[in-house]
């Protein structure tokens, strides 16, 4: 398995993965919305937001895991996409927050849309995606990573906590929320400092 920037040929797989992973959750989006978003990232290109994918080589996909497949030099230059994540470095690429306490700094790196195919979970892919985002942020001159996670999602919350992310704030519930049975789980904003030398200057 390897993590790399998404390619044009990955669009369909990425859309399928995101739609399946978030189906039935508070963060589900129409397929047309996801398609437009992924195409904008992968095909059109955006220097302020990037999509990464976790890719299984061909032998790994056949065997359902790593092992021998990882020893193949490049058995699948276009292996199966089993993970997806985005990272942005500008508030312009992110939807505005109603609660200002839930807004990451405008010029901070923001991790979002992390998901792993159901058939590939518990293989360390989520951790690999997070680590790849952090490596990319450092390479670009950033010093920290911010993200949001739902408080009713124990697996990703445990992953981020285990990787050193700390809670910054929690979303306030709307006074009218839940009156008609549509109560949403609150989000938690988290941050991880990648370096503490005071230098945080993205180079585009």
Spell out what each predicted region is.
Residues 2-16:
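A short beta-loop-alpha structural element at the N-terminal edge
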């Amino acid at each position: 398995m390897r993590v790399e920037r998404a390619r044009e040929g990955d669009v369909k797989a990425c859309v399928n993965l995101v739609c399946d992973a978030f189906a039935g959750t508070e963060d589900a989006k129409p397929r047309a919305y996801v398609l437009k978003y992924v195409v904008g990232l992968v095909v059109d290109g955006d220097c302020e937001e990037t999509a990464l994918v976790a890719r299984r080589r061909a032998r790994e996909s056949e065997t359902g895991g790593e092992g021998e497949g990882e020893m193949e030099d490049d058995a699948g230059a276009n292996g199966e996409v089993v993970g997806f994540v985005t990272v942005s470095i500008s508030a312009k690429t992110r939807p505005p927050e109603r609660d200002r306490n839930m807004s990451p700094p405008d010029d901070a790196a923001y991790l979002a849309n992390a998901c792993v195919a159901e058939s590939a979970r518990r293989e360390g892919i989520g951790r690999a995606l997070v680590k790849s985002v952090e490596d990319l942020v450092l390479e670009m001159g950033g010093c920290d990573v911010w993200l949001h996670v739902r408080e009713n999602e124990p697996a990703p919350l445990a992953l981020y906590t285990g990787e050193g992310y700390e809670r910054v704030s929690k979303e306030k519930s709307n006074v009218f929320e839940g009156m008609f049975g549509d109560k949403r789980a609150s989000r938690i904003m988290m941050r991880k400092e990648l370096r503490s030398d005071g230098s945080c200057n993205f180079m585009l």
